[in-house]
């Protein structure tokens, strides 16, 4: 008997005639990054290693901007994500990406008191896991900085449709920027494919949005690009708490 396999999301191809529009968007993004670097003594980019984050990373490296880059190694990342980190270090040897990990005792206590996969039990349990593995390490990563950057885009989810370029992170008392906020998925991939920017191998396996291994799965063609993130929850709760 033939087993039916649903068609999965695929990396969008470069659209014909998009070169001029992409060049304009790229120039605007460069200007935004230069503005951020020039107006802050210590700006730091929180890279999730997603495709849009790799666009920003490539421009920071290419423009030699004074913007530090870090990523959150949650302890639950896919092997493909860790492999990407190694590739980034080879492609951009002059650039250091700092890794911030959860406090080991807190992560162990969560597992021992609640269970290894307790994040499937409730939104509260999942958010507590995200707090330990993402939010607390992020707070350490931007401590002392006067601005931080994200790779968030308006198109990504229902909770990001009004995302601005610049905002104030009142909870942390720091300026926050979303420099690629107005790029589309096609813009992101057109840049990556045209400039041979390294990206996570999971994208070729139907993952348009990538988080921790237990909380991410492939997405079917036509589904929301974040449908594979915390798929057991309501779409309006699908945030990890980093962007309060």
From Swiss-Prot:
Q: Which GO terms describe its biological process?
A: cysteine biosynthetic process; hydrogen sulfide biosynthetic process; sulfate assimilation, phosphoadenylyl sulfate reduction by phosphoadenylyl-sulfate reductase (thioredoxin)
Q: Which organism is it from?
A: Neisseria meningitidis serogroup A / serotype 4A (strain DSM 15465 / Z2491)
Predominant place of localization: cytoplasm
> Which pathway does the UniProt entry assign to this protein?
Sulfur metabolism; hydrogen sulfide biosynthesis; sulfite from sulfate
Kindly report, in one word, the top-level EC class recorded for this enzyme: oxidoreductase
* Active-site residues, Swiss-Prot/TrEMBL: 240
Residue numbers binding [4Fe-4S] cluster: 129-130, 212, 215
What cofactor is needed? [4Fe-4S] cluster
Q: Which domain of life is it from?
A: Bacteria
Looking up SUPFAM superfamilies in the UniProt record yields: Adenine nucleotide alpha hydrolases-like (SSF52402)
Q: How is the cofactor bound?
A: Binds 1 [4Fe-4S] cluster per subunit.
This one is known as: Adenosine 5'-phosphosulfate reductase
Q: Reaction(s) catalyzed by this protein?
A: [thioredoxin]-disulfide + sulfite + AMP + 2 H(+) = adenosine 5'-phosphosulfate + [thioredoxin]-dithiol
The task this protein performs is described as: Catalyzes the formation of sulfite from adenosine 5'-phosphosulfate (APS) using thioredoxin as an electron donor.
- PANTHER family recorded: 5'-ADENYLYLSULFATE REDUCTASE 1, CHLOROPLASTIC, 5'-ADENYLYLSULFATE REDUCTASE 3, CHLOROPLASTIC
Q: Where in the cell is it found?
A: Cytoplasm
Q: Matching HAMAP family, A to Z?
A: CysH
Q: Its Gene Ontology molecular function terms?
A: 4 iron, 4 sulfur cluster binding; adenylyl-sulfate reductase (thioredoxin) activity; metal ion binding; phosphoadenylyl-sulfate reductase (thioredoxin) activity
Q: Which EC numbers does the record give?
A: 1.8.4.10
In the record, the note on similarity to other proteins reads: Belongs to the PAPS reductase family. CysH subfamily.
């Amino acid at each position: 008997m033939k087993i039916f396999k649903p068609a999965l999301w695929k990396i969008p191809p470069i659209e014909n005639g998009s070169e001029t529009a992409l060049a304009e968007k790229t120039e605007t993004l460069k200007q935004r990054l230069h503005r951020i670097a020039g107006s802050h003594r210590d700006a730091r980019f929180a890279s999730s290693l997603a495709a849009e984050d790799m666009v920003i990373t490539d421009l920071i490296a290419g423009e030699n901007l004074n913007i530090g880059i870090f990523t959150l190694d949650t302890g639950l990342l896919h092997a493909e994500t860790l492999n990407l980190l190694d590739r980034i270090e080879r492609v951009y040897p002059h650039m250091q990406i700092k890794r911030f990990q959860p406090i080991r005792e807190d992560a162990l206590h969560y597992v021992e008191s609640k269970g290894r996969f307790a994040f499937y039990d409730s939104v509260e349990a999942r958010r507590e896991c995200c707090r330990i593995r993402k939010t607390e390490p992020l707070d350490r990563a931007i401590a002392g900085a006067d601005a931080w950057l994200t790779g968030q885009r308006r198109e990504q989810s229902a909770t990001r449709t009004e995302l601005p370029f610049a905002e104030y992170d009142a909870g942390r008392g720091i300026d926050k920027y979303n420099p690629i906020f107005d790029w589309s998925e096609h813009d992101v991939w057109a840049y990556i494919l045209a400039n041979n920017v390294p990206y996570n191998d999971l994208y070729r396996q139907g993952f348009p949005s990538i988080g921790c291994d237990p909380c991410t799965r492939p997405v079917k063609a036509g589904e929301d690009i974040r449908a594979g993130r915390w798929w057991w929850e309501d779409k309006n709760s699908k945030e990890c708490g980093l962007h309060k």
